[in-house]
Structures are given as C-alpha cells and as structure tokens.
Amino acid sequence: MVYAHNLGFPRIGIKREMKKTVEAYWRGEISQQQLQQQAIELQLTNWKIQAEAGVDLIPVGDFSWYDHVLDMAVRVGAIPSRFKALNSNITDTMFCMARGQAPNGIETSACEMTKWFDTNYHYIVPEFTTNQSFELHHDDLFKSTKLALENNYRAKPVILGPLSFLWLGKCKGESFNKLLLLEKLLPVYAEIFEQLSSLGVEWVQVDEPILVLDLPPEWQQAFLTTYQQLNFFNLKCLLATYFGSLDDNLSLTCQLPVDGLHIDYCRAPDQLDSVLSQLPAEKILSVGIIDGRNIWCNDLNRSLTLLENIQSSLGDRLWVAPSCSLLHVPIDLDQENKLDVELKSWFAFAKQKVAEAAFLTRGLREGRESIGAELKKNEEVIISRKTSKRIHNPNVEKKAASVTERLMRRQHEHSIRKNKQTAQLNLPLFPTTTIGSFPQTSQIRCLRRDYKQGKIDDALYEEKIRQEIAEVIGIQVKLGLDVLVHGELERNDMVEYFGELLDGIAITSNGWVQSYGSRCVKPPIIFGDVSRERPMTLRWIEYAQSLTTKSVKGMLTGPVTILAWSFVRDDQPRSQTAKQIALALRDEVQDLERSGVRVIQIDEPAFRECLPLRKAAWQDYLEWAVKCFRLASCGVKDETQIHTHMCYSEFNDIIEAIAALDADVITIESSRSEMEILKSFEKFAYPNDIGPGIYDIHSPRIPRVAEIEELAVRALQYIPIERLWINPDCGLKTRNWEETKEALSRMVDAAKHLRKAFSSEKTPTIDLELQPAST
C-alpha cells in the first residue's frame, strides 16, 4: 500500500514551548523532571497533528532540546573528555557541550557549531580523537519510541546514519582518517537497532544526507562496506537523502542492503528518471514531493500526475513525503490571523504540508475523485498566485535590467581607499568594534511589542528607542571601543526588520523556525518584486552618530543573507531576487553616506551557506552573489569604509570570492575553531582588513584577557598587524548586559596590551608563543 510519511516535524512547539521551557531550565526555574514532562507533551502534540492529518508512519526521535546531531553524539558516547568529568547528569552534559555552561554553573569551552548543509539551521559539531571510544550512552530514542507505541502511533524512529555522523564531525588534536572509527561505532548502531526491534518497531529511518555531496572514493566505498556490516535486527531500513541529487552516488546507494530509499524531488527533480531506472525491484521509493524548506503550497494536481506516473512503475512500493524534515518551516498556518487573505492562501506550513502528503497519498490509493474538492480548491490557489498583480513591479524590473558592471566597482582599489580611510577615521592599531547588536532586554522586547500592537504611539516609541541608543553609545564610549554601533535595539531580527520595510515581502506573526538551540527566527516571505520606498535605518544611525565623535557604523543586512534567511518566491531565479534586494540596499547605503556616516557594515553571514552542495554549481552562484554584494556596497566614496560579517564559514575553497567582495573590513566567526579558519589565508594573500572573532558570543562563558590575547596572537600568524581588528564572534543580542560589558571590557584590555606589545617602536613583549593554533 502507498504510504504517507514524514521525515521530521518542528520541535519548538506551536507557541515556542520548547524555547521557553529549556531557557527556564537553564535559569534554574524548573526541574529536570519538569523539562522531561514538557518533552513528552510536545512530542505527543506533534504526533497527534501528523496522525490527524493522515500520516501513516510517524517520525520519532526527531525531537531534541538542542540539536539532533548533538543528541546522536551523546547517544553513542562521543562526549569529549573535558565534559565527562564535569557532569554525571547526561542532560546537563549535553547542554554543557552545546553552550559551554551547564545549568549547575559548570563552565568549559563549548563544542563548535556550524551550519547544517546549506540551511539556516546550526548543529553542534561532534569531536573525535584518535583513541575515540563509543558506547550506548542515552536512552532518549527508546523512551520516545515506547511512548509513541503506547499511544498507538505507528512509529518510525529517525536517526542520523553512521557515515553522515562521522563526516559532520571533526578531528580534535591529531588529524586522522575518521573512517577508522567505524569499527568501534557500528556495534553501537547495532545495539540501537536491536533495542528498537525489541520494542516492536517495523521501520527505521536512517538519514544519510551526505550522499548528495561530492564524496571521496573511500567514503563511497565505506557506504558499501558499512551497510553490508550493519545488523538491523529485522528492522526495515528507509535510507533518507535530502537537500540535493544523488548523482554519482546513485549507483552505490541502490546497491546498499536497505529496504527503501527517500529522495528529495523538490531540490533535484532531474534525478527521478535515473533513480527509477536503477532502483532494485524489491525496494520502496519515498518521493519527497512536498517542499520541506519553503512555505508555498504544493501544486497538488501537478504532483498527483507525477506520482501517478511513478505508481504505474512501482505500484505499492511508492511512498509520499516532504522533501526533508519539516524542521525548516513554521508549524501551523492556522496561527496566522494578520496575514493578507490572498497571500495566506498561497502558503503551507508543517501542519499543512503533512496534510498535502496525505491528500496525495489518498489520491493514489483511492483515485483522484476521492480528493476532488481539495484538488479544485488547490487549483484556484495556484491560479491566484500566478495571476496576482501584487507580484510584479515594472519599475523594479526596469531598474534591475539597467544594472551595469560600473555600478559594481569602487572608485579605487583597497590600498588607496585604506590610506584615505586611515586619515579620516584616525583608528589605533588593533581597532576594536562589535558586530552590531547589543543585548535585547525584556523591556526592549516589550517596548517593540507594545508599539506593534498600537499600545504606544510613534512619538513615545521613538523617545524610548533613542534613550536606549544613547545608553548603548555611552556604554561603548566608557568601555573604550573604537568604532561603535547603535545596538540594533529597534530590530527584532536582522532579516525580519528589513522584511517589514521592503515592498514585496510579507511578515508572519508566528512563523517561527529553529536556528540553533533555543534560538528561533521568523523568516520573512519574499512573494514579489522587492523595492525600498523610504530610508530604513537612517534616523536611528544619524541619532546615534550625533551622540559621539567616534564613528558609528551604519548596519545593514546583505542581499544574499536576506535571500537565504527568508522564504523566497520560486517563480524566478534566486539571483534575480537577490539583485532586487541589492538595489534597495544600495539606495540605503548612499543615504547613510550622504548623512555623514563614515563606516557602513553590510552583513553577509549566509554567504557561504548558500553555496551549492555540489562544486559543479559553485561558480554560477559565487558570480551572482559577489555581484549583488558589490551592487549594494560600491556606490560610495573611497573614504567610506565598508565592513561585512560572515558566520561559520570555511573559507579555503571560496577565498577568492570573499576577496572579490572587496569589503574594506571583513569580520568572521573563528573563536570556537581556535582560529583554525584563518588557515585559509596561509596561501592566499587576503588584501583587506580582517577581524577574526576573538571570543564566542554563543556561550555565556566570559573569556579571560589572556585567552583573547592568545587568539589574537594566533591570528597574527595569518594577518598583518596593521590589518587586524579585534571584535567578538557575532552580534551580542542573545547575551545579557552583565556578560556583555565584562567580556567587552576584557576584549578592550586585550587590545591595549597588544598595542603596547606590538607597537612599531619595540619588539613584541607579550608572553605568548607566536605559532599557529593546534588542530
């Protein structure tokens, strides 16, 4: 029989219950027993939503208090030694690994965090050593599975596969071949399967998303040997791939001794024919035809026609599903009461997407007439979106068509610009700055909420925000920072803020998705041509600059990041949408410069995350991404200093594109990797200034001055003294004021020590070894 199933459901809860509960636990306001009870309630709610929608096989094990990769590391006992001695409690150990701090107050350096493939979700990077051991260490998956079965759900446990788990981890200390760990790891996977089998489970979903990457031959071979060795203890295995095409990994994937294969049709429709021709006759094919990464409702008529054709070949060996876990979309469109009615009709969130999968499955089982009403209603929605006049703006399209190469070049090269900027800004050696945002207190959030709800008027809101900006400027001046920021206190999110002010973009009220841990974001929805009617940031930056003689940065989010962190229209190339955003930002940059702002930061933390997973597609993306950044940034004089910021970026393979952005200063996240990221600059002479993140803002732990100095000295192995900036890893929005002021004070002290030690008149006197960071 054709089944409807799902690869994973959002964890955060319809009202973000997960976030509120886990943060209360971190603050010591609730017990661990209360934490676990909330986990049970959230999972039961998620399973009920899916079952009532008509999903046949319910994913179990997709819930996590922080991250599913972290959960897998803890489950198999891959707990770094620095955490083992700190906590006997496995839940607190997990939180300590993620945050560097456990609820009991114990601190140590957190595990590294990076992006999950090309999404805006972040995972905690497993750490492996040459003497790594594994053991079954956590029974969370078994408890959840048992709970689902006891509540009469047909449970399909979900786990990250062994090859993807190793690939996503990193060697700590001495480098070695991670595949050597399989011999110790596979018996633990076998234990997991044995226990799941003993519970009465029929199917298990094993996620191996790295099969859509360019894999080295030894990793391809490892798939064959690994899955031949794995003992599933009579469980049926659905091997799940997503985010791209199997391509050269298709043949080996079809050879694996598993019972079914899931493919991402939405991201890689061209692979379908090859999959159908190579799939062994006894295997299930799960077709991910509902887009798990975007919010547009499915064209059910078109999808059903495609699935009917597949069914004619596969019969009951066809399953229907979203393309990937629904972790990446909001939970329930029914919670949106303020969206324009026509716009809302075009959308589908997680609850609606599992219903779409169930509708299609029913159509395959019982015939089109069984879902005739749904098909008719859906057809009306599809036509409405295609013909709506609100999508196209002739003025925007004309402006985009008139863009020339000249608009994407600065007046002179960086060396000339730097001399002019140095004379104007009068900055010291090792200039200090922050990335942009400052702590968002409950008072600030309440102020913005009251303003949005109409409880306070424009005048009072502006007065209050100005008071907050003045306080932030005063704190920075007192701390001794060199280039200041206004704190972004008027912004709820670095992308949503601009989404609210740009035409062609809609904002939801409850469209939250998980970014990392308890951090949730509310991506804007780009539904039409994008344009700027009026200045978006000017009044706040002008006011902040009026309070100090030091430079205050204008703060903008770049075109690629706005694109990456939004749900984007799918009726034109993403590059075209990015160009429209870049033109709107260019107008804003020029307005800021005309007002006297001398430093303007255009954040592009998502620049690398948008990179296609397959290298063959890189060049096309990098060309248009670089052009869009330059289109936004190059309309200013030489004297205006352009900054950009990037997150979690491995630069080695795209360093030339980073340089091509031609930002005067780039700040990057690097502290968790202990400056390892700067190895990119060993062979490439990056010409502009760099500010490697000198302390980790994602952890509440405050670094010692000596630690900051040590990281700066490591950075000097790759960056000339006159080009090195001192700054945190990222914005400070999620930290509290006590942590922020103390950490920045230590950062400024470290910069002063460095200036003294590395002044041009004397030999460095700082008591640190000048050698590259260990890897």
Curated annotation (Swiss-Prot):
GO terms for molecular function: 5-methyltetrahydropteroyltriglutamate-homocysteine S-methyltransferase activity; zinc ion binding. Pfam families: Meth_synt_1 (PF08267), Meth_synt_2 (PF01717). Binds 1 zinc ion per subunit. PANTHER family: 5-METHYLTETRAHYDROPTEROYLTRIGLUTAMATE--HOMOCYSTEINE METHYLTRANSFERASE (PTHR30519). The active site is at H698 (proton donor). The keyword Phosphoprotein does not apply. It catalyses: 5-methyltetrahydropteroyltri-L-glutamate + L-homocysteine = tetrahydropteroyltri-L-glutamate + L-methionine. Pathway: Amino-acid biosynthesis; L-methionine biosynthesis via de novo pathway; L-methionine from L-homocysteine (MetE route): step 1/1. L-methionine binds at I435, G436, S437, E488, D603. The gene is metE. Zn(2+) binds at H645, C647, E669, C730. Its cofactor is Zn(2+). L-homocysteine binds at I435, G436, S437, E488, D603. The keyword Transport does not apply. Keywords: Amino-acid biosynthesis, Metal-binding, Methionine biosynthesis, Methyltransferase, Repeat, Transferase, Zinc. Catalyzes the transfer of a methyl group from 5-methyltetrahydrofolate to homocysteine resulting in methionine formation. This is 5-methyltetrahydropteroyltriglutamate--homocysteine methyltransferase. GO terms for biological process: methionine biosynthetic process; methylation. InterPro entries: Cbl-indep_Met_Synth_N, Cobalamin-indep_Met_synthase, Met_Synth_C/arc, UROD/MetE-like_sf. HAMAP family: Meth_synth. 5-methyltetrahydropteroyltri-L-glutamate binds at R16, E17, M18, K19, K115, R519, C520, W565, E609. It comes from Coxiella burnetii (strain RSA 331 / Henzerling II). Its EC number is 2.1.1.14. Belongs to the vitamin-B12 independent methionine synthase family. NCBIfam families: met_syn_B12ind, PRK05222.1.
